[in-house]
Amino acid sequence: MRLTNVTSMSAQRILGNNTEDVDRESVRLASGDRIYHAAYDPAGLAISNKLRSRLRSMQQANRNANDSVSMIQVGEGVLSSVHEMGARLKELALQSSNDTMGDSERQMADLEFQNLKIEIKRILGAAKFNGQNLFDELGGKHDFQVGINNDQKADRITYDMKKVLKSADTVGLGNGSIATKGQSHKVLYPIDDMISEVSRARAVLGSMQKRVETVSQGIMIGYENEMASESKIRDIEYVLLTANLLISKLKQDSTIAWLAQANMESKNIEKLL
């Protein structure tokens, strides 16, 4: 006669559940991930994955912003050099305007003057960042993608060379010369205009850099907030999980003892029969 040990069957079922709980909590504790498998929390996993995608996008947007700042700083550095050369042009023009200068001295001063003009045009035309022209006519517009979406106003900042600086030819003073006193007088105002234009361009770049840096700070604040939200959904609470694991192990141990007792009782009954 075969006996059905209902108590043993119940104990085995409960032991299986307890073992599953222990395994699940152990995996979570080892991985640090509350949703180690999608079955643990399907909705939470979907939200967490979406947040993680946004977080990675925000990281890239912040890198874009940092690269944009670097590009602006390169341009500002070039304009700083041009500004210094403009100041030297003004010195030479004033020196050549003075009657203490003879024709030969003016010719020597004009040689430096012309070379500075050539260098200004060259440095503006050669200014590049990662192969992108900054100030010459080929530069055009550059979009700084500092957002994670496709909104032209909200997610991009446009660098427009034509709005930042006039052409290199204009800044370079064209055919200006200080070979004579009269010519020296004529270039004084154009040099002042050139210096003012470069100063204005530097101010434009400075304000643009400040804007991009502000956007970058906003990105990181949003990143921190969304990271905290994602962490609450996905990450485990070690204290709570450790307590749950301990409880599950205690249940598992007690169920094993119960199962052993149920099996022993079943064997004793079989012996009596």
Language-model segment annotations:
Residues 1-10, 20, 34-37, 49, ...:
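Amphipathic alpha-helical coiled-coil/heptad-repeat segments
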Residues 16-23, 49-60:
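Parallel, heptad-repeat alpha-helical coiled-coil signal-transduction segments
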Residues 242-247:
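A short, polar/charged loop-to-alpha-helix boundary motif
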